[in-house]
A protein has these predicted regions:
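ATP-binding N-terminal substructure of ATP-dependent carboxylate-amine bond-forming enzymes
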Residues: 1-131, 135-137, 141, 160-168, ...
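A short glycine-rich, hydrophobically flanked beta-strand micro-motif that places a catalytic Asp/Glu
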Residues: 38, 218-222, 230, 302-314
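Active-site nucleotide/adenylate-binding loops and adjacent lid/helix of ATP-dependent enzymes
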Residues: 2-8, 13-24, 90-94, 133-226
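Phosphate-binding site of ATP-dependent enzymes
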Residues: 196-275, 279, 283, 317-318
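ATP-dependent carboxylate activation and anion-phosphoryl transfer catalytic cores
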Residues: 3, 9, 279-393
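Residue-level detector of anion-binding/catalytic polar loops
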Residues: 36, 124, 152, 217, ...
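Short acidic-glycine loop/turn motifs at beta-strand connectors
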Residues: 43-46, 236-239, 312-315
Length: 393
């Protein structure tokens, strides 16, 4: 019997379109003899849709047309089953959902919000837990956790938007303790959205003003001179995990921007056979693998994640830039370099999810009995004690 895997993507996020690219790629790589893929698209108003045509990226050229031929749906619990249900007066059942694979990026789908909803329903889902997903979305919390656990990160300062608006001078003075050039980043966005490299205070102020409409928390980091950028993926859970090959990012600008990632498509230049070439010493590459696993475990990640590194080759140092708990395309290109097909990657993620769910189900979820059955008795005893004290007076 095939498992029905609900693939949820889209969402109210600035990375909406990136999510569609990832999801349509992955949905067409499942073993259809073992799994039935159920596409669940969430539009920018957070309305859920189902339709077989949602598996093809070609249809998304006209979103209005996509939604016209799709059904509005909800994911609900009926007894011990999870049902994808058509919205409307009659609420027709579309199918049972055995497992969910979230493939959204950014707010709501990657930051623990969707994971929290699925967790509350009790639906098994691929990937990191609510807490790990939330940490993975917040660059500030990540860095503070990494620092505490002796994982190297670049020097940084962070602040809330209202702090800059109320006392700009204090915030700038604090930032100016760092060494220029600096990166200004919204704390909770991915895909290099809203990131600027600045060389002086004038550029810094402008970059902060550009970042504030995107996030309530801003992080400013020191840059690495003559930087090399590299990615590595980790798959598994906190008990057991393994690393992919390492990819050096080829960039034509000062940093790996949104335009290079998705518009010009430079990330597609590295074919699997070109990945894992010796970009630094063997010792530094081994350090990267160890730090990647440590970062994965520190936040409590599960499934597959991608860890991005900054390399100072001259001084023989590596820094963890960030961890992504739902990497684009599930970082499958990094695993293909290790002779693992996209279908095999999906199969491994489903096995990890089943294992995680079994462990979760084995833990105590609630206490037997009902304390409220004794409420009147307990209340009566308290009242009696109060009366006894009053009588003693």
């Amino acid at each position: 019997m095939r498992l029905n895997i609900g693939v949820i993507f889209g969402g109210k996020s600035v990375e909406h379109e990136i999510s569609i690219i990832s999801a349509t790629e992955i949905m067409n790589s499942f073993d259809t003899n073992k799994y039935k893929v159920v596409p669940i698209y969430i539009d920018k108003d957070n309305t859920w849709y189902y339709g077989e045509h949602l598996k093809s990226i070609l249809h998304y050229r006209d979103i209005a047309l996509v939604k016209r031929y799709a059904k509005k749906v909800s994911l609900v619990k009926r007894g011990k089953s999870f049902i994808l249900e058509e919205q409307g007066f009659f609420k027709k059942n579309i199918c049972v959902i055995d497992m969910v694979m979230p493939l959204g990026h950014g707010a709501y789908l990657e930051d623990g919000s969707l994971q929290g909803y699925l967790n509350m329903l009790g639906v098994p889902f691929v990937g990191s837990s609510v807490i790990a997903s939330a940490i993975g979305q917040d660059k500030v919390i990540q860095k503070e956790l990494f620092e505490f656990n002796n994982i190297p990160v670049c020097k940084y300062i962070w602040f809330n938007d209202f702090e800059f608006e109320k006392n700009k001078k204090d915030v700038l003075d604090k930032i100016n303790t760092l060494k220029y050039p600096l990166y200004v980043k919204p704390a909770s966005l991915g895909s290099s959205i809203g990131i600027n490299l600045v060389k002086d205070e004038k550029e810094l102020t402008r970059a902060i003003k550009e970042a504030i409409p995107l996030d309530s928390k801003i992080i400013v980091e020191e840059s690495v001179p003559n930087v090399k950028e590299a990615n590595i993926s980790v798959m598994g859970n906190t008990e057991k995990c393994t690393t992919s090959e390492i990819e050096e990012i080829s960039i034509n600008s000062e940093f790996y921007s949104f335009k290079e990632k998705y518009v010009e498509g430079y990330n597609k230049l590295n074919k699997p056979e070109e990945i894992n070439k010796p970009i630094v010493s063997k010792e530094m590459m081994e350090d990267m693998r160890n730090y990647a696993i440590k970062a994965f475990k520190v936040i409590g990640a599960s499934g597959v994640a991608r860890i991005d590194f900054l390399i100072d080759d001259k001084n023989k140092k590596v820094f963890v830039n960030e961890i992504n708990t739902i990497p684009g395309d599930l970082a499958s290109y990094l695993w293909m370099a290790k002779k693992m097909t996209q279908g095999e990657l999906i199969e491994n993620l489903i096995k990890i999810t089943i294992s995680n769910q079994k462990k979760k189900d084995s833990k105590l979820q609630a206490f037997e009995g009902n304390l409220l059955e004794q409420y009147d008795i307990l209340k009566g005893k308290k009242l009696q004690k109060k009366k006894d004290k009053e009588n003693q007076k």
